[in-house]
Amino acid sequence: MTAPHLHAVKGGSQEVPFQDASLDIWDKKYRLKTKEGEAVDATLEETYERVARALSEVETTPALKKKWHKKFLWALQHGAIPAGRIISNAGAQEHKPATSTINCTVSGTVADSMDDILKKVYESGLTLKAGCGIGYEFSTLRPKGGYVSGAGAYTSGPMSFMDIYDKMCFTVSSAGGRRGAQMATFDVGHPDVFDFIKAKREDGRLRQFNLSLLITTAFVEAVKADGEWKLAFPVGAGEKDKGTFDADAEDIIWRDWPQKEGYIVNDDGLVACRVTRTVPARRLWDSIMASTYDYAEPGFILIDKVNELNNNWFCENIRATNPCGEQPLPPYGSCLLGSVNLTRFVEKPFTKEAFFNWDSYKETVSIFTRMLDNVVEINGLPLPQQQQEIMNKRRHGMGYLGLGSTLTMMGHKYGSDESLKFTEEVTRELAMTGWRAALDLAKEKGPAPILQQDFTVTQEMLYKRPEMKKDGYKIGDIVKGSVLHAKYSRYMQKVAKQDPALADELAEVGARFTHHSSIAPTGTISLSLANNASNGIEPSFAHHYARNVIREGKKSKEKVDVFSYELLAYRELINQKAMPYSEDEDAKLPEYFITAEDITPKQHVDIQAEAQKWIDSSISKTANVPTEYPFEDFKNIYEYAYDMDLKGCTTFRFNPEVFQGVLVKETDLENTTYQFTLEDGETIEVKGNEEIEYDGETHSAANLFDALKEGYYGKF
């Protein structure tokens, strides 16, 4: 095999050599190889060349192909990093013909029937086989103990069906060599919500899933008011047909529901639900918070906020997200991703003269927007419903990575007033540049088809957007999708305040795509292609730490030693001796070199709130919480996130009794003792960072313990 090779990454006027871990991950995950394992991409430059060529081939004339090949290659060399599926699979059809360039999908609505449950298992199996992550909502399934008339029996409930999807995902990902990713969402008003909260407590159960609750505004307000909360499930339309349904009965409430067919629906589009149980809202809230405090799940999706701010509010009802949560999507929805490496635009880093090159940044974002739009044409999605969705709306999610590293390079502390100002500005410029490109592309290539469609104004539409009534619209009027998108989307109304003329033209012409931005966690592309710049919107976890990575053929995760990009850059450009926590005065880092543990949960939320103003989809972000953080204060983080208009909130508190994280500090490992029982019954205790010989391999004690406990040992 050709030896792996990466050039250095530019850092100011000099270059920062790639670390071994970055080179290794590129070679294992993103470098194109033949089925025999021979490298097709000799260098990273050849990887970028392959991607640029594949995406420029979408253009319609030889002259355009040549022009945009050159520009795409320039953007890739100046901070544009497409998501992993694009880097891996674009231009790779000769070697991987059945793979997709799409990271994010959501299943079609899982209807409450055995036929549809199993149909969706089949569809999701094909989706995972293509390399995509997938999300589902499972609260559409009737609660445990519900009568199934066709079978003359009682259902085992949603959790048991989730087990089927979990086993399918594990089997498909084991066969395909790439671990599958799934998200399960669940309504906070479903009668089985307590079971969902505890679903992963059993070792090894549902480990192919992330879990998130769909938290409604009504529920949060009930918690704040110390009120009651009704758990309910939709009433079948058959009751109305039989004349046994009473809309005014005390046990009937009306709720937004993803599926209308087969249920009783009022004029506002709400579904009749029968209450099965009433609980104190704070009791349910405390149960959610306790689980999140100890187990980091379930996640917290403010679903009413998601739908209120959805650009496609007029034609979608979102109930699920991709596995990492940065893309709330409709049934069969898909979204491709890309991130701009912010560290590439810092000039004169670590000096008083440090500044951000806005012109170069905006040029990269503009070119990258066209590049990502071209990915739609080579999406490789396996299902016709997915193809129709992505071609009709042309969603993509551009975000950034390296925010924490960039702030450090500019001398700002993450969470400070200066950092909040920069976060809003860098996100706003990404958004406005993207929407200007959306208009230019629509004029050149045509808008997203959904925005050319005519829509009939309904009572539900006027209920959601009362300003339409003030503008003279009435039920039955016909209005273009481009108008509903550009004029009445809550997000696009903010764009209009920045640039009224742009919004007016988007309403008239239509945008090339309905959505432009989201911020992904970017774990492996940050580590590899960005030389371990901080993930997504996050600060650096630490400046020198261990990362647990899956290795093909290895029976547990491997602990890899890594350095933050800003530390590498500082050592290369300023002080070669510098190291974190050094007692040597000549080796100490500046005080603005902070990490995730130095940042309060409130500061995490504040940063996310500044970015969310200009991100039209969502943001994957984790607020790190100290192990000893008081539970009552922990609960306040989530209320604060709600008050700050976030679409979701995720926290992580180190708890070695429950799981081993992807990112691990050496001090945490050293301070944690793991107990193993040998075949002869003898018990041994070892520190988490100690190495153990087991089954012919060397493992860190923490990773071996986790693999054995969770049941994935030897199955990667």
Where are these regions (language model features)?
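Acidic/polar, glycine-rich intrinsically disordered N-terminal extensions of enzymes
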Residues: 1-101, 248-272, 285-292, 635, ...
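Long, charged, mostly alpha-helical binding arms that flank functional sites
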Residues: 334-398, 408, 582-588
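Short secondary-structure subsegments characteristic of cysteine-rich extracellular domains
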Residues: 45, 49, 417-432
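Glycine-rich phosphate/pyrophosphate-binding loops
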Residues: 130-142, 179-184, 410-418, 618-621, ...
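Active-site cavity-forming subdomains of large catalytic enzyme subunits
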Residues: 3-17, 102-358, 381-389, 434-476, ...
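Catalytic alpha/beta core of large soluble enzyme barrels
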Residues: 22, 326-328, 372-377, 447, ...
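Active-site-adjacent structural elements in folded domains
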Residues: 87-92, 358, 382-393, 406, ...
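Core structural elements
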Residues: 18-26, 73-94, 188-189, 369-378, ...
